[in-house]
Amino acid sequence: DVLGVTVEGKDLALYEVEGEIYATDDLCTHGAARMSDGYLEGREIECPLHQGRFDVCTGRALCAPVTENIKTYAVKIENLRVMIDLS
């Protein structure tokens, strides 16, 4: 599952992969597409605009046309709340 959220004015995409939560910027590094509108398969998110893919756990760009990695953020669950480190 993928969910778009805004935290302290920053648009993020949250992903559930094998029971773990991961977070990246919500904007693709290649074009103005929201990753939260993309297709998640395993740990790979496909950009809905040009079908480039990223590893949501590491942010690594996996295939053309994306070449720049996407920023990831540390996530932890505390008292059933998702806590995201924006630094």
Curated annotation (Swiss-Prot):
Pathway: Aromatic compound metabolism; naphthalene degradation. Pfam families: Rieske. Residues 1-84 form the Rieske domain. Coiled coil: none annotated. The keyword Iron-sulfur applies. [2Fe-2S] cluster binds at residues 28, 30, 47, 50. Keywords: 2Fe-2S, Aromatic hydrocarbons catabolism, Electron transport, Iron, Iron-sulfur, Metal-binding, Plasmid, Transport. Component of the naphthalene dioxygenase (NDO) multicomponent enzyme system which catalyzes the incorporation of both atoms of molecular oxygen into naphthalene to form cis-(1R,2S)-dihydroxy-1,2-dihydronaphthalene. Functions as an intermediate electron transfer protein via a specific interaction with iron sulfur protein components (ISP) (NdoB and NdoC). The naphthalene dioxygenase (NDO) multicomponent enzyme system is composed of an electron transfer component and a dioxygenase component (iron sulfur protein (ISP)). The electron transfer component is composed of a ferredoxin reductase (NdoR) and a ferredoxin (NdoA), and the dioxygenase component is formed of a heterohexamer (trimer of heterodimers) of three large alpha subunits (NdoB) and three small beta subunits (NdoC). This is Naphthalene 1,2-dioxygenase system, ferredoxin component. The gene is ndoA.
